[in-house]
């Protein structure tokens, strides 16, 4: 179902997006905070898209975390809020979560009602607002938003590397070099009993030190090269990860645009059908009124004729 695909199973949150913040109880001024602005259709569409992107990131992060043991990930609603702000919707994580909760609850009610109706005349989209409220349905719900939520498709999660990988630090390499050189420093002080012994030992130590430095340079160079290679690989992986995210966002945006075009076309057809039905109803109403008027005139004429006949007899 579309409801399961979009992950609408969220806990209910008291209050909608238009509910004002709690007053300053116990304060001296008693001033209430400003009322939050209403969500526009475009903001809701960005919210839906941001939730899809955030859920994709969560799935990819979990897969990468199981494989590589990455660090903590950004909370889902904080990620949704960041996506919204990048696309011009300045809403916080709490606002996004509350608006989605209300949107999910209203969608479930409408979806359940539409699945139970037997005729198109009982559809939620044909009802007046007062009739909707009598049937405990949302007073208003945007048709385009409903169609996107109902027919939305989330792309499959692709396991990728997490951004939690940290590059190898230069301090670690330097500390390894210091540890390797420390034995030489400890053994570099010769103990001589005579000038000849000192000279011989210095020559021997110089030869040994040269050989040791040659041997040590080889693994050190290998370690440095290996560290730089791993850093480059991680940088390339992070770069490819960012490019994949951008491509996915572009693909989602194009998909949303195509869905909007299809929805607008369907809404136009539905509106044309509704106008045709209304015109037909008005035409039938006019014909009925005309028939009633003609019948009333005929009855009045007969009554006048009867009164005239009675007057003539008198």
From Swiss-Prot:
Region described as Disordered: spans on this chain: 1-34, 207-255
Localization (cell): Nucleus
Keyword Magnesium assigned: no
Alphabetical GO biological process terms: cellular response to molecule of bacterial origin; defense response; negative regulation of DNA-templated transcription; negative regulation of immune response; regulation of DNA-templated transcription
Domain Myb-like, residue spans: 38-104
Position of sequence motif EAR 1: 161-165
Reported impact of residue 189 to D: Phospho-mimetic sequence variation. Normal transcriptional repressor activity but enhanced DNA-binding affinity leading to compromised microbe-associated molecular patterns- (MAMPs) triggered immunity (PTI) responses
Motif (Nuclear localization signal) on chain: 84-91
Origin superkingdom: Eukaryota
Record carries keyword DNA-binding: yes
Motif position, EAR 2: 280-284
Resulting phenotype, residue 196 to A: Normal flg22-induced phosphorylation by MPK4
InterPro entries according to UniProt: Myb_DNA-bind_4, SANT/Myb
Modification(s) after translation: Phosphorylated on Thr-189 by MPK4 in response to microbe-associated molecular patterns (MAMPs, e.g. flg22, elf18, chitin, and LPS). This phosphorylation enhances DNA-binding and thus negatively regulates immune gene expression.
GO molecular function, one term: DNA-binding transcription factor activity
Post-translational modification Phosphothreonine, affected residues: 189
Cysteines engaged in disulfide bonds, as pairs: none
Effect of gene knockout: Enhanced disease resistance to virulent bacterial pathogen infection such as P.syringae pv tomato (Pst) DC3000 and P.syringae pv maculicola (Psm) ES4326 associated with immune gene activation.
Keywords: DNA-binding, Nucleus, Phosphoprotein, Plant defense, Repeat, Repressor, Transcription, Transcription regulation
Cellular component GO terms held in the UniProt record: nucleus
Matches recorded under PANTHER family: TRIHELIX TRANSCRIPTION FACTOR ASR3
Domain remark in the UniProt entry: EAR motifs are involved in transcriptional repressor activity.
Function: Transcriptional repressor that binds DNA and plays a negative role in regulating microbe-associated molecular patterns-(MAMPs, e.g. flg22, elf18, chitin, and LPS) triggered immunity (PTI) by negatively regulating immune gene expression.
Subunit structure: Homodimer. Interacts directly with MPK4.
Protein known as: Trihelix transcription factor ASR3
Taxonomic lineage of the native organism: Eukaryota, Viridiplantae, Streptophyta, Embryophyta, Tracheophyta
